[in-house]
Amino acid sequence: MATALCYVPLIQSVWASNLEAEFERISWALHGHGYSRVTVDTEFYLARPDCSSNNIHPHCQSPEQRYKDVRARVDGGLGIRQLGLTLSSDHPGYPDLVWEFNFGCGLHRLPLDLETDNIQPKPQPWPRHQDPRYSNMEPINSYNFSKLLHYSGLLCNFDVTWVFFHSAYDIAFLLKLATFYRPLPPSLSDFYSGITTFFGGSHCIFDLKYLSCCTNHLYGGLDHVSKSLGVERIAGEAHQAGSDSLLTSHTYECMIYACFPFDRAARHAGILYGIHHI
């Protein structure tokens, strides 16, 4: 099933100067205007190559051990560069609303490739260096983002469904932002308690990477899975958080329709690829 879209959504670039105004738009969309699905993608950089807690291959680890690796990296070595957020509605004709939040971490850090677990040899260019329009843009302060995140209506909202692709690090970063960058919880059970508090519990979370593993024919990264379903990237570029969150949202819609009819995806809710499955 290929998606047929007659419009190209605007990916709203968000910096310190327009952060508050864009969160007001998010709050408006969530409160009585039909938007109830949130798709998130994060792009981040590896600040310290030695931040992993051990050298055991993830396939040989328990979920608790995998979580400790994620915690060690997110608390000790990864800097968030961008957060992409797409709001979608089940009502026909409602356009997707897409934001790309630009943070100040990792301007010259090496990006981590989660598919190979290796440091990529060349740093990806920072958007403000690619385009003169961004040269004077001030990156977002994480504390200000966290404060507005709490006021927006995204957190502790049990009417919202959260969608990710390879969710372990995305959710870990979101939880840090929700707790004003406090260290992640020490255990996996405490981590899930935080997820329940801020994101409505496991039944509200779907990991597209895990869902693809539950089919007989979908595998690989986001681009490969989306192409297998006939879903095209209609705005932005790969590895830019806003574009990836939008593509993840469209791919989720298509996958649910094609592979999980009659609400069969519900049985797979709350399973985080990278922690419970790999």
Regions of interest found by a model, annotated:
Residues A2-L87:
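Entry/capping segment at the start of metal-dependent catalytic domains
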Residues S53, L78-I278:
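Metal-dependent phosphoesterase core characteristic of DEDDh/y 3'-5' exonuclease domains
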